[in-house]
């Protein structure tokens, strides 16, 4: 486990994947009190407030001119993985509503990715743009077609 935290590029690639393809495309909460959003919008107590991590992960205003590009390097500063603020990168939500399984999911993703990378060569067959299928959690419409070959680990 301790070794996983030193795999900076792996963490950057996982976060970049979830920036573009978050596991939950949109979510909503109910306002506990009357409030005013930073842009001046009044939110009445009990109102549903919906946010869209899928759209936020692609916003040029938030991520820059290359917001639609898969670019793990955007997470690396001074050679190390640096996490963004929860409200810029809302995949795990933030504040008191932060996902309880966040750390466990990151360890699981890194572990599975390492096992797959070590044991298999994976090539995407069709490099067309992935399309989300509507639903509570993220699925790709039509799936992702890939060729998987076992690596020769005897070398």
UniProtKB/Swiss-Prot annotation:
Keywords: Heme, Iron, Metal-binding, Monooxygenase, Oxidoreductase
Transmembrane recorded as keyword: no
Required cofactor names: heme
Binding residue positions for heme: 99
GO molecular function, one term: heme binding
Induction: Down-regulated in response to mixed metal ion contamination (cadmium, copper, lead and zinc), but not in response to zinc ion contamination.
Domain of life: Eukaryota
Enzyme Commission code: 1.14.-.-
PANTHER family with a match to the protein in the record: CYTOCHROME P450
Family: Belongs to the cytochrome P450 family.
Protein name: Cytochrome P450
